């Protein structure tokens, strides 16, 4: 029996959206969170140059601009952080994203020394890290840096998780999967594109082939190749449409595998994993 309806309900995906309304919904969500927590004045997000961080970043910037205007409190701001490992091959894309976002402040924190130091420390302890595992260390180090900045600036860390990513568990546990607030949650991949189009983004910012690009042995590996299923199929599934049995089984397999990522650390009272 297909899990489709249950998953759609859990992730809150609509079969169709009005982009302008969803932009407003995300902006109001971000603003309400900051207003509810008066000790928070900053939104922090790592910008990779991909669709998701570009969209979340622009939403964050617009949200703090509105708060400054509406409250008169000029201390609200958005900090965008570039977090390359060494030299990023598609740095030009990241710069184009920043030009669209127009953040109040941009920081660059190169994570290479921290990641390599961790790998070497593990090696000295007799633990040889695989390329895949090193990729997860990169993702977690990026979040360490974002939380360090947030901690020094009275900030909250934005996550870029959305429905098409959540359903497949295509994120690093306590890496990019760790954040304070998720303004894109409920949207699938094509709906995120629609929001960027509505916001006037250049097509190159949302038509770029999605890639986590964490593995050095597989540079630029496309998400769809890693997942074995297309975002078109994932989006159709999340919108309640019929897809091939093979694609459906693949998506639901990823859903089961990623259950542990969608929960806080397991307690004795949890039974979802049994």
Swiss-Prot record:
Q: Under the GO molecular function aspect, what terms does this record hold?
A: ATP binding; glutaminase activity; metal ion binding; NAD+ synthase (glutamine-hydrolyzing) activity; NAD+ synthase activity
Sequence similarity:
Belongs to the NAD synthetase family.
Which Enzyme Commission numbers does its entry carry? 6.3.1.5
Species = Streptococcus uberis (strain ATCC BAA-854 / 0140J)
Q: Which keywords does this chain's UniProt record carry?
A: ATP-binding, Ligase, Magnesium, Metal-binding, NAD, Nucleotide-binding
Q: Name one GO cellular component term.
A: cytoplasm
From the UniProt record, give the pathway where this protein acts: Cofactor biosynthesis; NAD(+) biosynthesis; NAD(+) from deamido-NAD(+) (ammonia route): step 1/1
User: What does it do?
Assistant: Catalyzes the ATP-dependent amidation of deamido-NAD to form NAD. Uses ammonia as a nitrogen source.
What do we know about how this protein assembles, alone or with others?
A: Homodimer.
One Gene Ontology biological process? NAD biosynthetic process
Q: Keyword rRNA-binding on this protein? A: no
The catalysed reaction is:
deamido-NAD(+) + NH4(+) + ATP = AMP + diphosphate + NAD(+) + H(+)
Q: Name one Pfam family in it.
A: NAD_synthase
> Quick check: keyword DNA-binding in the entry?
no
- Protein residues bound to ATP: 46-53, 160, 189, 211
Query: Which NCBIfam families does this chain map to?
Result: nadE, PRK00768.1
Q: Kindly list the positions annotated as binding Mg(2+).
A: 52, 165
Q: Which residues are deamido-NAD(+)-binding? A: 140, 173, 180, 260-261
Enzyme class per UniProt: ligase
Q: What is this protein called?
A: NH(3)-dependent NAD(+) synthetase
């Amino acid at each position: 029996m297909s899990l489709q309806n249950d998953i759609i309900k859990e992730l809150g995906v609509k079969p169709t959206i009005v982009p302008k309304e969803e932009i407003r919904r995300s902006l109001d969500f971000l603003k309400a969170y900051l207003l509810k927590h008066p000790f928070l004045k900053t939104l922090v997000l790592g910008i990779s140059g991909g669709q998701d961080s570009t969209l979340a970043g622009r939403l964050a910037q617009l949200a703090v601009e509105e708060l400054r205007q509406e409250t008169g409190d000029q201390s609200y701001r958005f900090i965008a952080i570039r977090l390359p490992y060494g030299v990023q091959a598609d740095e030009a894309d990241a710069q184009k994203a920043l030009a669209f976002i127009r953040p109040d402040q941009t920081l660059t924190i190169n994570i290479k020394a921290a990641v390599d130091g961790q790998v070497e420390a593990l090696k000295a302890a007799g633990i040889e890290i695989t390329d895949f595992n090193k990729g997860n260390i990169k993702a977690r180090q990026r979040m360490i840096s974002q939380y360090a900045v947030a901690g020094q600036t009275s900030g909250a860390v934005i996550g870029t998780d959305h429905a098409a990513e959540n359903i497949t568990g295509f994120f690093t546990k306590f890496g990019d999967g760790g954040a304070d607030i998720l303004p894109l949650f409920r949207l699938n991949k094509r709906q995120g594109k629609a929001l960027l189009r509505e916001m006037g983004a250049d097509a190159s910012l949302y038509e770029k082939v999605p890639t986590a690009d964490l593995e050095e042995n597989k540079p630029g590996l496309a998400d769809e190749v890693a997942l074995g299923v297309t975002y078109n199929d994932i989006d159709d599934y999340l919108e309640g449409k019929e897809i091939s049995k093979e694609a459906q089984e693949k998506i639901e397999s990823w859903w089961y595998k990623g259950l542990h990522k969608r929960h806080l650390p397991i307690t004795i009272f949890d039974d979802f994993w049994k």
